[in-house]
Amino acid sequence: MPIITLPDGSQRTFDHPVSVAEVAQSIGAGLAKATVAGKVDGKLVDACDLIDHDATLQIITPKDEEGVEIIRHSCAHLVGHAVKQLYPTAKMVIGPVIDEGFYYDIAYERPFTPEDVAAIEQRMRELIDRDYDVVKKMTPREQVIEVFKSRGEDYKLRLIDDMPDEKAMGLYYHEEYVDMCRGPHVPNTRFLKAFKLTKLSGAYWRGDAKNEQLQRVYGTAWADKKQLAAYIQRIEEAEKRDHRKLGKRLDLFHTQEEAPGMVFWHPNGWTVYQVLEQYMRAVQRENGYLEIKTPQVVDRVLWEKSGHWANYAENMFTTESESRDYAIKPMNCPCHVQVYNQGLKSYRELPLRLAEFGACHRNEPSGALHGIMRVRGFTQDDAHIFCTEEQMQAESAAFIKLTRQVYADFGFQDIQLKLSTRPERRVGSGELWDRAEEALAAALESAGLPYELQPGEGAFYGPKIEFSLKDCLGRVWQCGTLQLDFNLPVRLGAEYVSENNERQHPVMLHRAILGSFERFIGILIEHYEGAFPAWLAPTQAVIMNITDKQGEFALEVERTLNQGGFRAKCDLRNEKIGFKIREHTLLKVPYLLVIGDREVETHSVAVRTREGVDLGTMPVEQFREMLAQAVARRGRQELE
């Protein structure tokens, strides 16, 4: 007689093993109809699964996050059902859930086309309209093998070989179609109406380019059509903001096949890059950092000492010269330790904060490259703080404060923090880890910031804090990192003389705020849709004459602004003023200055914003002061 305890503490007693669906029915017909699955003693199970013991039960519906994940997973199986009906010779591979959607990898004799995707989606809708039950059968291993052998599903057989310890497996039947899965899945296709197939891409079996190529059909699914419509609107907005499209339209940068994963910065984009670098340089100088520059090509001996050669060599670009092996640095840390090691340090010299705008290269897979967001050549706002154990908390707190200030200057207020603690495999004593984790937690708490704890997610050499930004579309971007390291100073012989005149290894704090300049600029482009705040805009003001008579004064205004440290340019083309205003509005120049005869006479400019707001006519000096205030506000003006 199982006693079922529900989330509100109420209990229900049954005189026989009972399914999740039956428990839901005993509560109410409405809940039974909405039941997707259950969570028994904290474990997700199918609605049809029996409970034969006293247990806690949470009914899972589409309103729950787990319910939406189950809907997405079941939609992937529905893709399989539709594909096998339309293309019977296709071989189904795997169909997992991903962030906000799902995909299915498929082997087929020809590439799918957009028309094929439309046909698959239409067939899926027809199958949903049949309102059929999805039937789960736990099946002995040998029978599972026979099922997929008889259907010619070679990839499923290979996946079964990967699970030698599984004696029985869940088979889920969508009418005549069958798929293998741990589940759970929806009990009926009526839950799958709010879906859409989104794109096609290539993939490889087991993710290895040496293996056979597959086709990947992506889709998204939601609890209801309202959520689906909101998602589609968000995706359309994100496409409008795609940094690759805006990068071309605003003449910021380009990439090309001859240099995959490398960025060709154009004058406009390089201006943004330089403003970013100059800003970070000033911020770091004000906060006690010493800027250094280290080599890009370093002998493998150093990478062997640091451990990178053994653990990271496949991601490093290497070369050989005069019988010596070299690597282009994928990160700056070992080189920074070399600078620290020049001369024995005293505890009085700590903390020592070494910063570098370090150019790094990593041999990322070509399929992973994405505009300037995921590249092979990038520059980090990298710094390493060498300090004593006693200084860990103060240095961490100072960095957290600095990071929040920097993000606010770029217009980001919604910051998410995660604290990752010790993994099972690690270096350093338990006491050292205790102190390090306590230092990071105390630093976060002293800043009054909420954070998510991620037990076991730290690196083997120390705990870390991750800083993520939420942009205007609600997307979360992990950018900043504060990583404590007990390992590298030991491996590379970094020492200092303590107060007791003993040699000790410093703690090393790896830290970055932006992450990489390239990716951060990509985030800024998409966040602002290319309409950078005045302080970042490649051109802050454009001066336009109405006729040739005002050309000389327009050039004088340009000189005045540029000599004042601003970025202004003239547009003296013999075009209608409306045409010029529209063109520079599309180029997202913050301020558009129009000069006619009256402005020449009064030594003034008529000022418009790119949003079309008429700020009126004002003396040049007044505009200069207004622009100076806008630049000084940085991105914080977007928060007011």
From Swiss-Prot:
Supply the alphabetized keyword list: Aminoacyl-tRNA synthetase, ATP-binding, Cytoplasm, Ligase, Metal-binding, Nucleotide-binding, Protein biosynthesis, RNA-binding, tRNA-binding, Zinc
| Gene Ontology molecular functions | ATP binding; metal ion binding; threonine-tRNA ligase activity; tRNA binding
Catalyzed reactions per annotation: tRNA(Thr) + L-threonine + ATP = L-threonyl-tRNA(Thr) + AMP + diphosphate + H(+)
Q: Which GO terms describe its cellular component?
A: cytosol
Where does the record place the region Catalytic?
242-533
What SMART domains does the record point to? tRNA_SAD (SM00863)
Q: Which cofactor does it need?
A: Zn(2+)
State the free-text cofactor note.
Binds 1 zinc ion per subunit.
Q: In its UniProt entry, what is this protein called?
A: Threonine--tRNA ligase
Q: Which organism is it from?
A: Azotobacter vinelandii (strain DJ / ATCC BAA-1303)
Q: Which gene encodes it?
A: thrS
